[in-house]
A protein has these predicted regions:
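Short, well-structured N-terminal submotif of metal-dependent ribonuclease cores
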Residues: 1-40, 55-69, 145-150, 155
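Acidic, PIN/NYN-like endoribonuclease modules and their adjacent C-terminal/linker elements
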Residues: 111-155
């Protein structure tokens, strides 16, 4: 079973401000590379670059990564993971997701990738852990019960 990975998981891999989440994200992503079970949406790569290059007040105005470092990391993501791209169905499904589930545009867009491409899970800390949106279950890999402890939708 393949899972779609939200940008927040990828950002934590490069964010030393929360060592526990950084370690968990790194372990999860490394395991996903080996197993081939994690997929990134084009949106997650774009959001990753924007998030890690944005100035951070708590870092004295410095970003998590320089633009050059972020570009290298984004290119590695493109090389290491399967990346899915938007099409008409993804956009239409996202538009419906904002109305049906009350999701923000970016969350609805990420969910739409999973729904349209047939992924059973989204790994994210931005949605409600364990909730199903259509055929897609959201799992927060940082939650106490973790990725593999939730029962499948149709067991």
């Amino acid at each position: 079973m393949a899972s779609l990975v939200d940008s927040n998981i990828v950002v934590y891999r490069c964010d030393p401000r929360d060592p526990d989440k950084q370690r968990a994200a790194d372990e999860l992503l490394r395991a996903g590379i080996v197993s081939g079970t994690l997929v990134l949406a084009h949106q997650s790569v774009v959001e990753f670059f924007a998030a890690v290059t944005r100035p951070r007040r708590d870092l004295g105005g410095a970003p998590l990564l320089s633009a050059d470092e972020a570009r290298i990391q984004a290119e590695l993501l493109l090389a290491e993971f399967r990346v899915v791209y938007p099409n008409r169905d993804v956009v239409q499904t996202a538009l419906r997701g904002t109305a049906t589930y009350g999701l923000s545009w970016f969350d609805a867009h990420l969910w739409a990738y999973a729904e349209v491409y047939g992924f059973e899970e989204i790994l994210s800390e931005d949605f409600t852990h364990g909730r199903h949106y259509g055929t897609v279950r959201v799992v927060n890999p940082f939650a106490a019960d973790g990725v593999h402890e939730l029962p499948p939708l149709y067991a």
